[in-house]
Amino acid sequence: MKPLTPRQQQVFDLIKSKIEVTGMPPTRAEIARELGFRSANAAEEHLKALARKQVIEIVPGASRGIRILLEEEAANDEPGLPLIGRVAAGEPILAQEHVEMHYQVDPSMFRPQADFLLRVHGESMKDIGIMDGDLLAVHKTQDVRNGQVVVARVEDDVTVKRLERKGSTVLLHAENEEFAPIEVDLTSQQLTIEGIAVGIIRNTDWM
């Protein structure tokens, strides 16, 4: 990682602080106000510089579309696959505070290779064998096709569903008739694909 300038470090520290305190990243206007910039455009230029240095990711079309990347790198420093529990709003899915532990399982046993495990909550995908408490092996990618089971972030909620794109609308289908599809209007809602499901580990097999 390239070193940050003092001003960039101030912006980065403010983003981290806002996420820790409020659960959400700041808007450009909030950054400008708190750090004394003349306009939100000045804040945007600093954010672009941080993105070029790969410490944050800017999510297009969202006023609070800022994601910190450094924690994701730190989560991958330990051997094994990181197990992700609950995910806080506005934070990277691989942020250190989300990692419950690392499982000593070979990522290459999955195709494509798994990058992390996600603890499944609920029974919305039980009809295809994804049960409450299972560990879902996930390959981190945003390159997905219709019909794939994905880990998606809708606004601030993370969910596991089957993807269907219809123009500017995305339907996230459950595999349980008791659950209605989640409909996402991409013109007004933020959708981030965190990865695709590549396998299941029954939690009881590893505890």
From Swiss-Prot:
Matching SUPFAM superfamilies: LexA/Signal peptidase, Winged helix' DNA-binding domain
Cysteines joined through disulfide linkages: none
Top class in the EC scheme: hydrolase
Gene Ontology terms describing biological process: DNA repair; DNA replication; negative regulation of DNA-templated transcription; proteolysis; SOS response
Keywords assigned: Autocatalytic cleavage, DNA damage, DNA repair, DNA replication, DNA-binding, Hydrolase, Repressor, SOS response, Transcription, Transcription regulation
A Pfam family recorded for this sequence: Peptidase_S24
E.C. code: 3.4.21.88
GO molecular function: DNA binding; serine-type endopeptidase activity
Site feature: Cleavage: A89, G90
InterPro entries, per database record: LexA, LexA-like, LexA/Signal_pep-like_sf, LexA_DNA-bd_dom, LexA_repressor, Peptidase_S24_LexA, Peptidase_S24_S26A/B/C, WH-like_DNA-bd_sf
DNA-binding region: 28-48
Active site: S124, K161
Reactions this protein catalyses: Hydrolysis of Ala-|-Gly bond in repressor LexA
Assembly: Homodimer.
PANTHER family membership: LEXA REPRESSOR, LEXA REPRESSOR-RELATED
Physiological role: Represses a number of genes involved in the response to DNA damage (SOS response), including recA and lexA. In the presence of single-stranded DNA, RecA interacts with LexA causing an autocatalytic cleavage which disrupts the DNA-binding part of LexA, leading to derepression of the SOS regulon and eventually DNA repair.
Protein family per UniProt: Belongs to the peptidase S24 family.
HAMAP family on file: LexA (MF_00015)
Name of the protein this chain belongs to: LexA repressor
